[in-house]
Amino acid sequence: LMVHEVLGVKIALGDHRSSFPTTQNVLDLLTQIRVGGMIAGKIGVLHIHLGNVTGAFEMFEEIVNRGFPIRHIRPTHCARDKYVFSKALEFAKRGGRIDITTGGSCCFESPADAVEAAWDAGIEPSIMTMSSDGHGSVPRFNEKGEMVGLGVGGVACNLRDLKKLIARGHAVEKVLPLLTRNVARGLGMKGKGEVSAGNSADLCLFD
């Protein structure tokens, strides 16, 4: 975390490709991230790839119940399946930030539907983000669960679902922060995420 560009650590939980760390392993890692962030002047986040094996959110609950700040725990792929999504909503209602992946597996017809379902469930829009998982590896499996190939995730999914949500009548000022301000604030990136005097001029223009 002393390296300027480093904001935290990424691991996988609840996935057949993960190392299946124990709750204490994860808590040890979170403590190092938190202390490193305090020294470096950053939030320090544990970015967590969620699979469809149960147990990850139960682990988060135990860690938070023991007094560890929830803001350091950042699960992604939160709409991978219905179970993960339901647990993600519980996590968000405790103040945890959740991320909906726009590329890859989704238990709804589209990630935009997952975002709407979270809003309908009363989740505060400011603690939600969307991400594409772009350029990530995308394994392909056959009906037997055997991997038969490996692809690369696309990067256009965020824009696709942004357009869907706006086309459905949601205000731009509610939808756009999923990809801008919410991300910047969640990662503690000062001067990023919104158009304001003194901020970086990171602008995209759309017709």
Predicted region positions:
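Metal-cofactor-binding active-site regions of metalloenzymes
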Residues: L1, E5-S19
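His/Asp/Glu-enriched, well-ordered alpha-helical/loop segment
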Residues: D120-N199, L203-F206
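Sequence-level motif detector for i,i+2 pairs with an aromatic at +2
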Residues: H4-V6, I70, P125, A201
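Active-site core of metal-dependent hydrolases
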Residues: R17-F20, N25-F141, E146-V152
